[in-house]
């Protein structure tokens, strides 16, 4: 019998059928319980079942508990943006998860274009609205929005100037964004 919480790959032996029955993410072959998916082993001692919690399932459990996620804006259309979720709260993800941000979920104020509030390459702090694919995000709340951005003219770091504007310290360019509470301010804070 393998160790609880250990990483397993499909086809690997977990237990014999006399010890544990098959559960989620497992199958039985010639009296041996084997992993059906990549994930962590979980033995249900009460029901005597051998389970494998797939990484997708584990990530979704973390997403449901998360207060916020960190994402990078990949592409923008007229009414939405495609975002790669790269972190759940303060923890980074090994591989990004795709999500989308609809224009109606950007601000409580009317905006005509997604680019009035975010730009490609911006790092945003967002909240999940759905836990099924496609994942939907919102940045409407006061503490959510852009937390890291670069100047569209020279590529230098933008610093928060006021409630809606960011200023480039190199070229002086001023850009408008929906700014989150952790946006870089003058002095690097």
Swiss-Prot record:
Chloroplast found in the keyword field: no
UniProt name for this protein: Exosome complex component Csl4
Source organism per UniProt: Saccharolobus solfataricus (strain ATCC 35092 / DSM 1617 / JCM 11322 / P2)
Entry keyword set: Cytoplasm, Exosome, Metal-binding, Zinc
Domain of life assignment: Archaea
SMART domains with a match to the protein in the record: S1
Residue ranges annotated for the S1 motif domain, each copy included: 66-142
Binding site for Zn(2+): 151, 154, 168, 171
Family from the record: Belongs to the CSL4 family.
Subunit note: Component of the archaeal exosome complex. Forms a trimer of Rrp4 and/or Csl4 subunits. The trimer associates with a hexameric ring-like arrangement composed of 3 Rrp41-Rrp42 heterodimers. Interacts with DnaG.
Entry's localization field: Cytoplasm
Gene: csl4
PANTHER family on file: 3'-5' EXORIBONUCLEASE CSL4-RELATED (PTHR12686), EXOSOME COMPLEX COMPONENT CSL4 (PTHR12686:SF8)
InterPro entries found in the cross-reference section: Csl4 (IPR039771), Exosome_cplx_N_dom (IPR025721), Exosome_Csl4_arc (IPR030850), NA-bd_OB-fold (IPR012340), S1_domain (IPR003029)
């Amino acid at each position: 019998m393998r160790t609880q919480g250990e990483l397993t790959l499909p086809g690997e032996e977990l237990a014999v059928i006399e010890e544990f029955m098959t559960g989620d993410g497992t199958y039985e072959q010639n009296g041996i319980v084997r992993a059906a998916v990549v994930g962590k082993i979980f033995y249900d001692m009460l029901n005597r079942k051998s389970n494998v919690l797939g990484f997708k399932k584990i990530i979704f459990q973390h997403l449901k508990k998360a207060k916020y996620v960190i994402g990078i804006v990949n592409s923008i259309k007229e009414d939405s943006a495609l975002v790669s979720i790269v972190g759940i709260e303060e923890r980074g993800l090994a591989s990004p998860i795709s999500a989308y941000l609809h224009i109606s979920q950007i601000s409580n104020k009317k905006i005509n274009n997604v680019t009035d509030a975010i730009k490609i390459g911006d790092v945003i702090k967002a909240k999940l609205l759905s836990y099924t694919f496609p994942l939907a995000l919102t940045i409407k709340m006061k503490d959510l929005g852009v937390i890291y951005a670069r100047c569209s003219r020279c590529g230098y770091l933008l610093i928060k100037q006021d409630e809606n504007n960011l200023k480039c310290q190199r070229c002086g360019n001023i850009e408008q964004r929906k700014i989150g509470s952790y946006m870089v301010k003058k002095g690097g804070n």
